[in-house]
């Protein structure tokens, strides 16, 4: 479990709270929940006051933060982010990108992001352009 995945459409379980959605991969693996780590992630994502809310009570940006929290909870070496800002407004998109950059720096995680947004792609250390299944330039 060294890869955390962040989906474009969040893929949150609608009947689970923010906290329960973040803990889902840990509980599915029957691992012990690290409550301190959970609280640190909620603070990192600025979701401490929303941890008992259901996904439908959150904005799109907050839902994407929950998806990021779920990925961070498993201590991945790599985070694969598939269009993480695709469904967000520009303010929320900026916030999500800043969180991913912060995760890269603070948690030493490699972020692999798929995006069609050139402005977001330009923020990366390295860009791979894939066209028709082939890498065209790097």
Whereabouts are the PLM-identified features?
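Conserved ABC ATPase signature
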Residues: 54-64
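Hydrophobic anchor residue at the start of the ABC signature
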Residues: 68
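Short coil-to-helix segment of the ABC ATPase nucleotide-binding domain corresponding to the Q-loop/switch region
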Residues: 16-23
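Catalytic Walker B motif of ABC-type/P-loop ATPase nucleotide-binding domains
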Residues: 79-82
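A short, proline-enriched helix->beta-strand linker immediately N-terminal to the Walker B motif
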Residues: 73-77
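ABC-type ATPase nucleotide-binding domains, specifically the catalytic core motifs of the NBD
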Residues: 23-35, 44
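Conserved catalytic loops of ABC-family nucleotide-binding domains
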Residues: 2, 102-113, 121
């Amino acid at each position: 479990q060294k890869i955390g995945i962040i989906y474009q459409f969040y893929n949150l379980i609608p009947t689970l709270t923010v906290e329960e959605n973040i803990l889902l991969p840990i509980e599915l693996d029957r691992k012990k929940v690290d409550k301190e780590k959970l609280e640190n992630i909620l603070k990192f994502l600025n979701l401490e006051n929303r941890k008992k809310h259901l996904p439908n009570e959150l904005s799109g940006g907050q839902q994407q933060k929950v998806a990021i929290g779920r990925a961070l909870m498993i201590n991945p070496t790599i985070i694969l982010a598939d269009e993480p800002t695709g469904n967000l407004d520009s303010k929320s998109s900026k916030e999500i990108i800043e969180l991913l950059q912060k995760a890269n720096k603070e948690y030493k995680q490699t972020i692999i992001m798929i995006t069609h947004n050139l402005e977001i792609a330009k923020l990366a250390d390295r860009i791979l352009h894939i066209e028709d299944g082939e890498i065209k330039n790097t």
